[in-house]
A protein has these predicted regions:
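Pyridoxal 5′-phosphate
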Residues: 1-376
């Protein structure tokens, strides 16, 4: 799956230790453990900023998940009926359902960024033309597709969007910790991350980096541990967007995962090597259809395919029950891309997620299993 599992051992150890010895409410007391918890949170913010190449003055906002982060960002913008919102065809419902919710409320227009239907890559020249015809107000795009593994050209799209003063939000859930990124001076205003994916941290923590100077109105309100006599939310970032008790156990796990973060270029190269090996083997199996961007240097370790004569969920069950192999099947919570893949008759795709701990021997078992299933 594109969710990473298992985690580095240090993640489990850090979460267990703090759950037993320091799971207190950060920012809600002056005693030593509360100060230590606050220090851990601030240290983790710094790690995230450094990993993402963000500006020193950028803010890191923690949430319970990337989905909630998308809600905080999109729910914090001031929408108008005249807004023009561009989205990539690769967007997860963590973004798309939120956008659709506000579109129904405000009536703004949503346009898909142009896609080359053959290469399954964004068409930058056509996107620039789209922007000249209908100027973007907001541009939303994933950094990496959780269906095809495609690495989107986020810097190039952001540069074009900024010529029209657009707000640019990137969902980096499948990228941060794997694909190098430098947010500083990129034109990207908000960059979402998920602790449990390519960062190799736990569930229960995600968030976003606010790199630009765009202010968001509070999406959620409540206690922050500061200015408690004031019924309005405190005006300072990131507290204005972080009501409620922080999940210090999950943040401790994320902190440990970030400390254990491997060299991203080396890790990405290893995933590509394994993915290319798997792809070449699958190409030789009759009845296997692959869904990939053409350029292997624009892919991560996600490999999606179908098998003629089977629905995706049927293959998933066979792999699980007969071979003890876990894969994700179906539409992967991505509503727009499948009309380009033309995979509806298969009930979506079968997705293999190659990660940090994948072994060559495991790929051989998978390839053998797919050969046997395809043969019937």
């Amino acid at each position: 799956a594109a969710t990473t599992f298992p985690k580095p051992e240090c993640v489990y150890q850090a979460m267990d230790e703090i759950a037993r010895t320091g799971a207190v409410n950060a920012g809600r007391g002056s005693y030593a453990l509360a100060r230590q918890a606050s220090g851990l949170i601030e240290s983790t913010r710094k790690q995230i900023k450094e990993l993402a190449g963000a500006d020193d003055v950028a803010e890191v906002v923690f949430t319970a998940s990337a989905t909630l982060a998308c809600n905080v960002i999109l729910g914090g913008l001031e929408w108008k009926q005249t807004d023009i919102v561009y989205v990539s065809p690769f967007e997860h419902n963590a973004m798309m359902r939120v956008l659709y919710h506000y579109q129904k409320q405000y009536g703004f227009k949503i346009i898909e960024l142009a896609l080359n239907r053959e290469s399954l890559e964004l068409d930058l020249s056509q996107i620039r033309f789209q922007f000249t015809r209908e100027h973007p107000t907001v541009v939303v795009m994933s950094h990496v597709s959780n269906v095809t593994g495609y690495i989107l050209p986020i810097n190039e799209v952001a540069e074009s969007a900024k010529q029209y003063g657009a707000v640019v939000a990137v969902d980096g859930s499948q990228a941060l910790g794997l694909v190098p990124v430098k947010l500083k001076e990129s034109g990207i205003d908000f960059y979402v991350f998920a602790g449990h994916k390519t960062l190799y941290g736990p569930f229960g923590v995600g968030g976003f980096i606010s790199e630009g100077d765009i202010s968001l109105k509070p999406f959620l309100v409540g206690g922050t541990g500061s200015d408690s006599l004031n019924l309005d939310m405190p005006g300072q970032m990131p507290g204005i967007l972080e009501p409620g008790s922080p999940n210090i156990v999950a943040i401790a796990g994320l902190h440990a995962a970030l400390e254990a973060c491997c060299d991203m270029e080396r890790q990405l190269s290893q995933e590509r090597k394994f993915a290319e090996y798997l792809i070449e083997k699958l190409k030789r199996i009759d009845g296997v259809l692959l869904y990939l961007p053409w350029d292997e240097m624009k892919r991560t370790g996600i490999v999606s395919f179908s098998i003629e004569g089977y629905r995706a969920d049927e293959v998933g069950m066979l792999l699980d029950e007969d071979y003890h192999i876990a894969v994700r099947t179906g539409y992967q919570c991505v509503p727009l891309i499948h009309k380009y893949l033309k995979d509806e008759k298969y009930g979506g795709v079968i997705r293999v997620g190659i990660g940090r701990f994948t072994k060559q021997s495991e790929l051989e078992i998978l390839i053998n299993a797919i050969e046997e299933i395809a043969e019937g």
